[in-house]
A protein has these predicted regions:
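Generic detector of short, locally flexible boundary/turn motifs and exposed helical patches
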Residues: 88-91, 144-148, 186-194, 230-237, ...
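N-terminal nucleic-acid engagement/recognition segments and initiation subdomains in replication
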Residues: 1-134, 153-156, 382-389, 419-420
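Feature primarily recognizes SF3-like P-loop helicase cores of small DNA viruses
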Residues: 97-119, 175, 205-206, 211-236, ...
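P-loop NTPase catalytic core of nucleic-acid-dependent motor ATPases
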Residues: 112-220, 370
């Protein structure tokens, strides 16, 4: 019986491939594994006994990660950085006798990871919610650990901010423009508290809000902290407002070929030891100040803020997020509560203080800018545009006076009317 050479060739190729622990690999005519096949690299990453199920895409950080330590390759779990591909390529070459190009491995890592997606933050929140004991801790969190006043506004601000963090994890595209400010109390552990409660998803490594090199780092965090307000002080107020209210961040990764657009999936906190730090009256509604008092602390964030306590907090905040009655849309009473709290942290310069005195001692319910100018000794405002602009700026942002006009004979004068 004649032997078909083609049948023998196919048999040898099948025997060669069968020797490998991963089946289905594409081979050359001589039975060797094809080195120019991204499919082969992907199959090895997905089916090799050592590598299978270990490579995944982190949906929160947008990074490819190794889910477990690989001591055989001296690789640790976590984001796959530039040190990992050489180890993986070396392992594949030694086991399969084929050396793949780095670009093929990079593509295969993406293909493999995208088939194994996870979100560690959502997994964490779900676990915290499932194990929450039902006890309310939010209202006492800042008073107990930072000595903040135990009040309705503290409770409101705490619930808003941390429930906002949960919401941004579940729905990054959601608009959330509140900022938690921890003020004063030097040495009380403000930064430590934020780090611990962030459960590892934290960064304070940025110095402004315009350098897009910072964005990738921010997007790996749940809470970003402008520590000592370094970035705030390095930015104009307009830039700060734009950053806080933005919903999408656009940047280019190092060595990236295209621009990346990501929904802003974090919330922002700030720390400062300067008490009267709110200097702009036009956009301060975004900020929620909390006065820290070290002498009133019951517990230390450094030694007493345990993982179990943090887990219970997030379980509670996740419960608020799930509660259909919870809303980030504040009613008038809540808005006024936040506004009154902010007044204690407003910076007032000498001219603003003089304007305040002028208004408090004015007996009529109507006043003009010229009246105010006379009272504070500014003289004719026609020749003093700087003070005229300052008066307008102050009056336009007061809640107890509103723009109005009054007739004096046949003439009408513009000014402000006191609200009852």
């Amino acid at each position: 019986m004649a032997v078909n050479k083609e049948d023998i060739k196919k048999l040898r190729e099948a025997q060669s491939v069968a020797e490998f622990p991963v089946q289905g690999l594409r081979t050359n005519q001589d039975g060797a594994i094809k080195a120019n096949s991204i499919t082969n690299v992907s199959l090895i990453l997905q089916r090799d006994p050592l590598l299978a199920g270990k490579i995944a895409f982190n949906e929160f950080t947008y990074e490819i990660e190794l889910l477990q330590d690989l001591p055989e390759l001296m690789l640790e779990k976590g984001p796959i950085d530039d040190d990992y591909p050489p180890a993986l390529l070396g392992y594949i070459e030694s086991k399969y006798g084929v050396m793949f190009a780095d670009r093929l491995l990079q593509g295969a890592l993406v293909n493999t990871a995208r088939k194994n997606v996870f979100n560690p933050v959502l997994d964490y929140f779900e676990d915290c919610y499932a194990n929450w004991d039902g006890k309310i801790r939010a209202d006492d969190f800042l008073p107990d650990f930072l000595g903040v006043e135990r009040s309705a506004v503290t409770a409101l601000q705490t619930r808003l901010f941390f429930t906002g963090a949960v919401a941004k994890a579940y729905k990054p595209e959601m608009k959330f423009d509140y900022v938690l400010d921890l003020v004063g109390g030097q040495g009380a552990g403000k930064t430590t508290l934020l780090k611990k409660v962030s459960n590892g998803w934290y960064t304070d490594q940025f110095t402004d809000f315009e350098n897009k090199d910072n964005y990738a780092n921010m997007l790996r965090a749940l809470i970003i902290n402008d520590d000592e307000m370094t970035a705030t002080n390095n930015s104009s107020f307009e830039v700060l407002k734009k950053f806080i209210s933005s919903e999408v961040m656009e940047y280019r990764k190092p060595y990236g070929r295209s621009t990346v657009r990501r929904a802003k999936s974090f919330v922002m906190a700030r720390t400062t030891n300067e008490v009267t730090y709110l200097k702009d009256k036009t956009g301060e509604r975004r900020f929620m100040p909390n006065m820290v008092n070290k002498s009133l602390q019951k517990y230390s964030p450094v030694t007493d803020l345990t993982q179990d306590y943090v887990d219970q907090l997030w379980g509670e905040f996740t419960a608020y997020y799930r509660d259909k009655n919870f809303s980030f849309q504040l009613d008038e009473e809540q808005e006024e509560l936040l506004n009154q709290n902010r007044q204690s942290f407003m910076y007032i310069d000498a001219e603003e203080e003089a304007i305040e005195v002028a208004l408090q001692t004015w007996n009529d319910d109507f006043i003009t800018s010229s009246d105010i100018g006379d009272r504070i000794g500014a003289g004719d405002l026609v020749n003093n545009r700087r003070v005229a602009k300052k008066i307008k700026y102050v009056m336009d942002n007061r809640k107890d006076w509103a723009p109005s006009h009054r007739k004096f004979g046949k003439a009408t004068r513009r000014g402000y009317r006191r609200l009852q």
